[in-house]
Design a protein with these regions (language model features):
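A domain-start/cap signature at the N-terminus of enzymes
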Residues: 20-95, 370-392, 399-401
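Short glycine-enriched nucleophile-adjacent loop
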Residues: 182-193, 199
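C-terminal catalytic histidine-bearing segment of alpha/beta-hydrolase fold enzymes
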Residues: 234-237, 244-329, 334-336
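Active-site-adjacent alpha-helix of alpha/beta-hydrolase-fold enzymes
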Residues: 225-255, 344-364
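Short beta-strand/loop motif that positions the catalytic acidic residue
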Residues: 220-224
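Gly/Ser-rich "nucleophile elbow"/oxyanion-hole loop immediately N-terminal to the catalytic nucleophile
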Residues: 87-93, 143-179, 191-195
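Active-site machinery of serine-nucleophile hydrolases
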Residues: 94-164
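C-terminal beta-sandwich/jelly-roll accessory domains of carbohydrate-active enzymes
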Residues: 294-401
Length: 401
């Protein structure tokens, strides 16, 4: 039976989605837009956003600032020590930040302490002249600890503190990892690709990954050739072919480079130096024209300029594909009953009508107000100093079989 989509849209400004939805709202094809009298101008919205970001930064330092001085990030029962180095003079746009995840070579603290110490100096000969280099120590000694979702927020805190304390650039943050650290890079980046300018892995095993999420997060894959029958090398080759195919079908996305290096010290140094050079050409794009968001085993609530309300529980396999073409927003796939679309003036012209097309059919056209409440929500909920939105549309979707 063909699926019929009944879509209702509301611009939910200053009210929670769950409070705005009634039992019959999803059966309507309509739009609710607040009075334009309450809308900000572009200049007013940008000024208000700057003010809130400054407040957010001060509040963040008050809550987490001691963690930078202590070189220790805490989350529940997890403790993540870290080392940091700030090298050279600060560039005009801020230091690039490199987060480097060490291998987990055993299950004892002493062995992994040694790996942590090695990682602190892994790129001594290849780091750029100006940067912040951070090596976190895995909070546990299990082989898969870097893959755990709890690490996402801990790394986010670490990045924010580097931005606030050392003048790092939140849009030039690069995630690196080797072997088990490389495993972690893949899992972290596919869950939260919008946090990173680019990622790089050396070795590692690649399983159960939603690489479609990496459309806007460039990837460097470095394979270590050691002459053995290495399952990781086979997995890596397969993944690189999959990324080749994704880029072939979507030429503006899925930027990646796959290369190999020898296993001795000098060869690794040269190979990883080239990887660092490749990464630095990229700056994070917080508002890409097109996004692909597919849930994995660990579900997330947001992806670039899309999110789901707290009342919606994402499921593994749920997928959204959306893109913006001037003032037209196209949503071609969506498994959620509700979907938030966040906008600002760099994405669309908010002084002109915006059209939303769902499943090939126009479902809304009109001007969207810039709202204080949306700016507040986008700044304080994400705590990401590179993101800011001033308008929001919520799609209410019912699938009738």
């Amino acid at each position: 039976m063909n699926k019929l989509y009944s879509v209702a849209l509301m611009c939910l400004i200053g009210i929670n989605a769950s409070k705005a939805v009634t039992t019959d709202a999803v059966t309507l094809v309509s739009a609710k837009v607040p009075s334009s009298k309450t809308s900000l101008s572009r200049t007013e919205a940008e000024t208000f956003a700057d003010t809130l970001r400054n407040i957010s930064k001060q509040a963040y330092l008050a809550q987490y600032g001691q963690a930078w001085d202590d070189h220790l990030i805490l989350k529940d029962s997890l403790r993540m020590p870290f080392s940091s180095r700030t090298i050279g003079e600060r560039p005009a746009d801020g230091y690039p930040i490199f987060i480097s995840l060490h291998d987990i070579a055993g299950t004892t603290a002493s062995v992994n302490d040694e790996q942590y110490q090695k990682q602190q100096h892994r790129y001594d000969q290849t780091l750029p002249a100006s940067c912040i280099y951070i090596t976190p120590r895995a909070p546990q000694n299990a082989n898969d600890i870097w893959q755990k979702p709890a690490l996402d927020s801990m790394l986010h805190t670490l990045v924010n503190l580097a931005v606030l304390n050392q003048g790092g650039n939140p849009n030039r943050v690069y995630l690196l990892g080797n072997m088990a650290g490389g495993d972690g890079v893949w899992h972290i980046a596919t869950r939260q690709p919008d946090h990173w300018a680019a990622i790089a892995t050396t070795g590692g095993h690649l399983e159960h990954l939603n690489i479609e999420n990496l459309r806007n997060a460039p990837v460097m894959v470095l394979t270590v050739e050691d002459g053995g029958n290495d399952t990781a090398r086979i997995e890596t080759a397969k993944l690189c072919r999959e990324m080749d195919k994704l880029q072939e079908n979507d030429t503006e996305g899925y930027k990646h480079q796959c290369s190999s290096t020898g296993n001795n010290g000098k060869q690794l140094e040269v190979g990883e130096g080239k990887a660092l050079d490749w990464l630095q050409q990229f700056t994070r794009n917080t508002i890409p024209q097109k996004v692909v968001w597919q849930q994995g085993e660990t579900v997330t609530g947001s992806h670039y300029w899309l999110s789901v309300p707290a009342t919606v529980t994402p499921q593994p396999g749920d997928k959204v594909t959306a893109e913006i073409d001037e003032n037209i927003i196209r949503v071609s796939k969506c498994n959620y009953p509700e979907l938030n679309i966040w906008l600002n003036d760099k994405m669309v012209d908010l002084d002109s009508p915006v059209t939303v097309i769902f499943d090939g059919k126009p479902v809304y056209k009109g001007k969207l107000p810039r709202k204080n409440s949306v700016i507040e929500e986008s700044v304080f909920n994400r705590n990401d100093f590179g993101f800011y939105y001033c308008s929001k549309i919520t799609l209410l979707i019912e699938v009738v079989k």
